[in-house]
Amino acid sequence: MPAQASTTFTGADFAWPNSPGVGHLGLYIEDDISHTRLMSTVRTQTGQLCTTLDDSACANQSVRTYSILPRCETDAQKDCVESLGATTSQGAVSEGAFSRYFPESGLADFEGSPGRNIPTGAAPSIFTLPGVPHNDGNEYMVIASVNGVAPVDGVQTPSSITIHASVYPVKVLAGNFMRNTPLENGFGVSHRSSDKWGNCASIADGYCAARQDFPANTKFSLSLRLSTPPKGWLHGRIFSPTVTYEAAGSSTRLKVDATPVQVAAVATWGKYSELPEAAKSGAMNCSDTSNCGQMNPQSSGAHISVEGWRSVYGDQASWVRGQWMYQTLSEYELVGSSLAACTSGPAKFDGFITTNATGYAAGPPVFDPVGKTLSYVVAAPHTNAEGGLIVGTYDLMMRSDLAACLYGGNVSDIVASVAVVYDNATSTTTEVKTDVTNDGTWFKVSASGFHYSMPTIKTTLASKSGALPSVNSAPSIIKKSVSARALATRAQLVVSRGDVVSLRVSKAWTKKCTVVRQTLRITKTGTCRVTVRVETRKQKPRFRTMTLQVVK
C-alpha cells in the first residue's frame, strides 16, 4: 500500500510562503520544475490542444509538441528511455528495472510520427534500483522529454528541439491528489489536487510520486535513444559528468553518468518600499499599495536576483534538495555567444556546463580572446536553512577541438588552470579542488569545494608544450621564400641576439610549403601552416603556429 502523505516528504516540506499582503514583492528561485507539472501534449502554435497529430485542429497547422519519452521495448525503437543505473562509492553497480508508468497514462498522450521526427508522448517512468535505497524506498522516476515545433506537414527540425532529462528518488503517497489537466487553450496546466502537490515529481489520481533524498556518494547513469541528438550545449544540475555519445543503429545513444548535486532555493517576500534598489529591478507596476506578486527569474536574471536580494533573505537558503537533471540550452541563450567563431552552431554537440548554483549566467562561458579565459558567473546563498555552508560545484566539458580553436593550438596540446574569483580576488580556500583533463576528444574542467556569494569561475587556456596561440596573418606576397626570423617577427615573437629560431611544417602542408635550412619555401599558392620556435638560454622555448595565405 502507498504511504499516507503524512509519513514522508510532502509538498509542505518545500512550500512557497504566502504573501504577507499588499505592497510586498516576492522572489522565488528554484530549478525550472515545469517538467514535473506538464504532460505529453500536441498543440497548435496558438495553444489549442489536439488529441492526435491527425486531429482536425492540428492536421493543417504548424504544431508544438511536448513528448515525455516512453521506455525502450525493442532494439529498433527510437526516442525512448533505454536504461537507468547507479554505482555506489564502493563500486557496486545496480541496473534499474522498469516498474510502471506514473500515471498509467497521461491525459493527452499521443502517437508520434517518425516521418515528421516527432516522438511519441507518454507518461513518466518509474524504475526500481534494489541495491540503491534512498531515504524511503528504492523507486526512481525518470522524466525525459523532447519538445519542438513542426511546420505544416513538415519535419520537426533540430534547431527547434529541446531535450530534457531528470531522475528523482520517489515514494508514492496516497492522498487527495488529482492529475494535472492540460488547458484546452494555452500552454499551461490546471492543478486540481487539494493536498499540497509542490513536491510531487508526478501525480496520478489519488497518488503523488513525492521526491525524496538521493543516497549519498552514488553516481546515476541514464541512457536515452534519440532520433535527433542534442546539438550545441547542454547545461545541468549534476557533478563530474561522463558523456557517451554514439550511434545506436539509426538512433544516437546519449548516456550521462553523474553524481546528483544539492541546489539551494530562495523563496522570500519583502516590503517593496524597504527593498534595496537592486531587488526592485525588473518589478512591474509594484508599490506599497499594490499586489506585487512574485518574480521567478530564470537563466541570466537568476544570479543577478540572488545577489540583489541577498540582504532580504539573509544570505540563507529557504531549502536545499538534490537534483539530477540536464537539458539543452535554447537558441535564445546562445545568441551572441563569444564562442561562436569556433562552435558548430546546430551541427554538433559542443559541450556541457553543470553547477549547483541557485543562479548562473545563461549560455556557455564567456570567452576573452586576449587573456584566453573562459568565465562563468554563479550565485547562491552562503548557508543552508540550518546555517551550514553551501559548497559549490562547477563542471565545464567541451570538445577538445573547440578548446584548441579558442586557444589557437593543437588539440592534444591544450591545458588549463582554474580559479574561483570573488570581486577580482582569487579564492585561497584550501578546500577548493580543481581538475583539468584533455583526452583529445573531450576537454574537461572541474571545480568544487568553494563557497558562495557570486564568484566567477575562470578557466585560463594554455599550451602544454609552451606554444603560443596561433596567428592568422593577412594574405602575403612571398616570391619564393621567407626566413625563420622574418616569420618570428610576423608571429609577434621577440627574438634577441643569440636566440635560435626554427621552423616546422607538418606533413599535411608540405605540398604547399617546406622548410629548407630554416627558410620557408613556397611551392604552391594557397594556405600554409607553419610552427615557429624560438629557443633562448634563460627561458623555455616559445612556440607559435601561423596560418598563412600565400601568393607565389
Where is each model-derived feature located?
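Hydrophobic core
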Residues: M1-P2
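Hydrophobic beta-strand residues in large extracellular and virion-surface proteins
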Residues: V142-A144, I161-A165, F220-L224, P241, ...
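Proteolytic processing hotspots in large secreted/extracellular or virion-associated proteins
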Residues: N356-V415
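Proteolytic cleavage junctions
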Residues: T428-S473
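Extracytoplasmic soluble-region selector
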Residues: L468-K552
